Structure formats: structure tokens, C-alpha cells
């Protein structure tokens, strides 16, 4: 019997299933000898488990890179690495996975960030079996969200990812972890019902009855139906992005999470909302998107300004960075709503860029907290001389967050600005107002970020803190993690085509789909209702 070729190998199924199945073996890892009640025993047990988890994460990343090299062509617009297997034929559920330019960059980002998050979790000794089981299960679930091509399967993956986050927050979080975890699960679980209801409605509308995303995208829906489905999806994905006013779970979750969970929340979780808006709202419901596009832009501007202003008022370091994340995701909304190739490309690049920058900042917040045991900015100060490496890394990552030229955030935001300024889908006054307000948000960002750096590292010295023996500089593991994140941040900033070439064909095809009517009529989006009165 001939072995399947590398092109026929189930790469994506393997990448999704491998960490989940490997996690099931964690309870079988033998415990070390000694007294289970001692700290030394807990450290030895955690060390065995963390090395196993890191090995699984690294090998899964290598498998993904091999599949990317063998079977993915960035020049194509359609789905690649496609696999379809009948799973539950009674309800029309199939195991269908594939990747294109909208999903492959985010799949790669997920594998990369999760591997670093597991390395960042090195100090965790509380219930290590459960902790690393959840981390690996979340690894597979998050890749599944970006890879699956079946609506029911997408919903299952979306829900699978929620449970590990809830447990990681509620068990390993801070003092208010139960409140934050409960708020997270209520927001996300309730909003997920909109995905299920809208997905079922689209599947059972017309013929054929199908949950396959390709079939759903090719169905013809009346405008009213599209608008209802679009609104339902927008609520669900707006919680995850997050969009104001559905954002309030995020500062609480970040305020209580540990460093590795921070990295997953900021680096991957928020991107699920942006990806779904592109894939389902814009890709499956293009007519409705013309109506909602200006709404997305307005919401994006509100995100940028409101979150930037809120960040000024925050005195908690984690919450301040969380608010900056909300602000940065506003550019994703503007890019998606711009209806231009460069704007849509900028939105995708902003998701990738923020994934790297957000993960780096929150990791450094965790590293700083491990040494200072406080998150209140008033209690910090003068620690820069004692921690020069952490100060240098924090400064570099903060400069990336404020979109310094030469770093990825600058390129992404400039692309969104150009897309919004040059689009012919909106009137000139609307474009000018949006660009001006977004620019105000960009100006506010360095003010609160640089002020934060000054307060932490060079503010009035807290001698009780600076003279504490635990206040030590970064260790090699921490320097390695930040270096792994800064290299692509700077690399993308200097040569963005390194990443944009992975998805430009897909984002351009999506924009072409959305603009089919506009070039023919010369109408702006504000006049879009006339397009559907024929």
C-alpha cells in the first residue's frame, strides 16, 4: 500500500488534534519521589510537565511550518490544505478544515504565541497538570477556530476555547479572579448563542441545507435576512474583538490573568473576532456589509478615542495596557469598513502586529509584577536602575505599541489611514472626520504609554521596593521570549511584504467581492440602499 504524499498529509487536522491528544497524557507523567506537601516536590513535578508541554508546542509549530512549506501557496486565493471528512451525517456535520490568506497568518501567529506563552509559564507550580492540560487544549482549539470550514464545527471550536480561558482565569488569576472569569464566560458564552442561531438560520435557508462555509457563502439571501444575520454575528464577534460597549470584560480579565494567559488573550483571542468579521460578516454577507461598513468605522473611531482616554485614568498597569489593546483594535474595524485593498490589508496586518506587541507588553507586565508584587503605578517608581534589561525591553515594546516608524504597528496603522483617506465609498467630509479623530487617538497613545514608562522606572523612588532582594533584572528565558517577539515586530516594520504577501490575494479578493456594486454605480456607501431597490 502506497504511503500518501506530503501534499495529501492531513496537516491541519494533525496540528489541531496533536496538542489536544497530547494533553490527555499529562496525567500519566510520573510524579517525582518525595513529600508531595513540599515546595521542592511541586517544583520538580512542574518541571517535568512544563518540559513535556513545551516539547508538544514546539513540535506542533514545526509540523505547521512543514505543512505551510509543502502545501500552502500565498499566490492562490482559494482554500488550501483542504480536508473534508463526513463526521455526523445525521446533522450534516463534517470535519472540514482549510486555510487561505485570511486564516493562515493567524494560524501561524497562534502557534508562535502559544509556544512562547508556555515558555512564559515556567514559574507556574500550582496544579501544573491541569494548567498545562488547559494550555495545550486551548492551543488546538484556537487553531481550530481559524482553520475549520464548517459552521457547526466553528461554533464548537469557539466554545472549546472558552472553557480553558475560564478555568485559567478562575484558578490562577488574581484576587478578583472569580469575578473576572465569571464576567468573561457570561459575555462570551451568551454572545456565542448569536453565532449558533445565525449559523443555523443560514444553513437551513434555501437549498442545499449545509453547514459548509463555502456553500453558505454561495447562497443567495434577501437583504433583510442578511442584515439580521450580520447584526447577530457583529454582537458575537464584537464581544471578542472587543467593540465598545461590549468591551468591559477585557480590563477585568487582563487585570486578574497571569502572564501566559495575558499573552493568549491579547495575542490570539482578540484576533478571533477580527478574523470572523472578515470571514463571515464581510465574506458571507457582502450586501449587508455595505450597510454596516460605516457603522464599523464609527465604532472603530469610538474604540480608538474612548479606550485611549480611559487609559489615561487607569492606575493599574494591566488595565492600562488592556485599554490600549481596545484602542488598537479600533484600526481593525476601520480597515474592514474602508472597502479598500490597502485598508483591508492594514486591518489584517494590525491584527498580526498587535498579537505580537500585545503579547510582549503583557509578558513584561507579568515579569514586572513578579518582582514588584504590585500593579499600582503610584507604588512603583525608580526601578529602572535596578532592572535595566526589563526597562529596555519595556521601552522597545512600548515604542512598538505607539507605532514608531520601523516597527509593525506603524505600517499597519498607516495602511489603514491611507485606505480610509483614499476610499471612494464615502463622502470626503466623512473621510476627513474619521482620519482626524483616528489621528487624535494616535497622538494620545504615546502620551499615556511614555508617561507609564516614566512612572514605573524613573518616577519618585519607592525605597521599600527598590531595596527589596527580589527586585532582580530579567533572566535569559525572559530576554529570549521578548527577542522572539521583537524580531518579527521590527522585521515586519522594515519589510512588511514579508507578511502581507501571505494574505494580499485573499484580502484583495474579499474587497473585490464587496465592491462589485460600487464601481458600477459610482454611488457611495451612504447611498447604498438604492442599490437594492431594483
Curated annotation (Swiss-Prot):
This chain is encoded by the gene named ndhD2
Q: Which cysteines are joined by disulfide bonds?
A: none
Query: Any idea where this protein resides?
Result: Cellular thylakoid membrane
Which reaction does this enzyme catalyse, per its entry?
Answer: a plastoquinone + NADH + (n+1) H(+)(in) = a plastoquinol + NAD(+) + n H(+)(out); a plastoquinone + NADPH + (n+1) H(+)(in) = a plastoquinol + NADP(+) + n H(+)(out)
Record lineage: Bacteria, Bacillati, Cyanobacteriota, Cyanophyceae, Synechococcales
Q: Which UniProt keywords apply?
A: Membrane, NAD, NADP, Plastoquinone, Quinone, Thylakoid, Translocase, Transmembrane, Transmembrane helix
Q: What is its EC number?
A: 7.1.1.-
* InterPro entries noted in UniProt: NADH_Q_OxRdtase_chain4, NADH_Q_OxRdtase_chainM/4, NADH_UbQ_OxRdtase, ND/Mrp_TM
Q: State a GO cellular component annotated for this protein.
A: plasma membrane-derived thylakoid membrane
Which source organism does the UniProt entry give? Synechococcus sp. (strain JA-2-3B'a(2-13)) (Cyanobacteria bacterium Yellowstone B-Prime)
Q: What is this protein called?
A: NAD(P)H-quinone oxidoreductase chain 4 2
